[in-house]
Amino acid sequence: MASKPTPSHKIWTRRVHIYSNELALQLKSIQKVGDRPQVRFYEGVGGIKTVFEDSLSAQSGNIVAYTSIEDQHKAIHNYFPEYYQRRKRNGIFMRAIFPNTPMGIERQGANLNEFRNSVLVPSETYGIHPAINVYDNKLMIASFREKLGIIIESAEIADAMKKIFELAWVGAEALDKKTKMP
């Protein structure tokens, strides 16, 4: 003969039912994340290197970038000269907007060797400190001062950032030409 469920058994059965329903709702919400951009954070100098290494996988063969050369080279000594050459070997062309600083001018002078086209903008007005690279369906941000790397993977966001870059490029080219006039 089966025994009657005890009050504690009923309580535990009820709790299991409630928790299983909550778990099912949480699992459903996780499934919906697929429609959202994937965002990855990387900390420290290693994290910054990680996001730059990811840019070397650009399938489109193109990167557009806004960056401060001074901050890049100060944050990670001896990394970028080799990175530039690996990007070139991988056939990934870069168009970049640099602040008009001594290092920006130096890097612009190395455009051909580093498989890049760059323009300079007045650093007092348009100087930035992080690097922002856009490639494929990714937006990469490297904050050298905060020691943080971020990759946002979203076709929609990357497309918008590429269009914003194109608009900035037109203005930056005009500023670059103006600074080179006698």
Residue ranges and their predicted role:
Residues A2-G91:
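PLD-like (HKD) phosphodiesterase/transphosphatidyltransferase domain
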